[in-house]
Amino acid sequence: MKKFTKILLIGCLLVMVSCNNWLDVDPKSQVKDKDLFASEMGFKEALSGVYSLMTKEGLYGKELTFGWLGVLGQEWTSVPYNYEDDQKYDFENAASEVRIDSVWTGLYNAIANANKLLKELEGKENLFSGDNYSIIKGEVLALRAYLHFDLLRIFGASCAVGMERIAIPYVTEYAPTIFPQEKVGDFVGKVLKDLQDAAKCLENDPILTGRTVSEIDDNGYLMNRQVHLNYYAVKGLMARVYLYKGDYANAEVCAKEVIGSGCFEWVKQENLTNESVADLTFSTEHLFALNIVTLGNIVDKYLDGGNNSFALEESRLSEYYGSSYDYRYLYLFKTGVGMSNTLRYLKKYDQLESVSWAQSYRNKLPLICLPEMYYILAECRYHSSGDVLEPLNEVCRHRGVADLSEADLSAFETLLLAEYRKEVIGGGQLFFQYKRLNRSVVPGTDVDLAGEGRYVILMPKEELENLGWVSNQ
């Protein structure tokens, strides 16, 4: 039995956030889940398990944020030695193959978990109180879409290259079935269908309705919606997907809905200046963030100056930001010590020790944020001859830098990518922007990614042995 089928069989809710013996797994890895899915609490735990899978270092806990995708986006000038080939877009080596296999398997495993949950939800509305059934279902559909979309952005051609290109499977069932590969356009259509269904399920999400939720309401289950794929996170993700597709009209509609909601506030400089209690991830701007309880340990291993750390030369950092008044330049990097004193290390994810440090700042790794909505709006307006400067300058004004001018728009794509780089460094999104626009070169390398076909990562070789599958490149 091939690996892909095995993922579908054993990807059954393998982790849990707060319970060590959450599952009873027999030697054949079959989950005894009758009790788990007999109560609303069991479904809540299962959903937490899907989010927890995403926090692993092989996925968003490192590789799909500041790690592997950060390297592919040329975000760092100094990388651990086992990423040096990836930095050159050479994936024909053992370290890269292990990393790619981990990403592929991890994302499809999380999707299998989501599909299992959706299957178990069928016909069990009577188990749930209030709006929890539809909200949980909406989150799971959104998770399935989110995970698939990132698989496509890694292992599929961009929409700009060809909607008819063969990509990868879109898995919608929990079953030992090998799903067929989809064309890029069809795959994106399925992502959007899941997101549209998710948004409908989330119409009673408190973040949308404005309903106040406290600890006495179902133990506060619907509090802290920004660490769940909430209604506005779904709309933000839809804006991202529509933009990737080149559907600027719908991307603009979704981005404007998020911006107009008033639910997300720009970080205030006063919350950045005190290093012991700073809001380093700009938490008020999060549409969706993961809560990673081991984030401090991850930072210590990879972003704190050791041999396995990712870092930037000060000269490159200054080149990126241009202004020493930029909040991101001022507050989000720390200087290396000793022989590393020319290097700058990202401190966005640092876990501060002060007891006064706000709980809402802790353990947060953002995946969708407010500034992206303004960049999407600007790009959509660029294609419709609208006011491009206003949304770009809205971000500038909340980052402590001067407004851009009409003269800056002479090379719009280059400008936009430079603004993205300032904002999303360490977040795993920059590589995808260059791929989406099919730019030949990512600054920091002379490899012709578009011309040499390096933007599409080859799926694990073992998967190509599956009957009927062809190369995704």
Regions found by a protein language model. Give the residues of each.
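Hydrophobic-face positions in mid-chain alpha helices that act as interaction patches
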Residues: 227-229, 246, 250-367, 423, ...
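Membrane-proximal, proline-rich intrinsically disordered regions
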Residues: 19-70, 255, 442-473
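Conserved, well-structured interaction surfaces
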Residues: 44, 83-155, 177-185, 195, ...
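Bacterial Sec-dependent N-terminal signal peptides
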Residues: 1-29
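Short, surface-exposed recognition loops and adjoining beta-strand edges that mediate ligand/DNA contacts
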Residues: 34, 63-78, 157-164, 168, ...
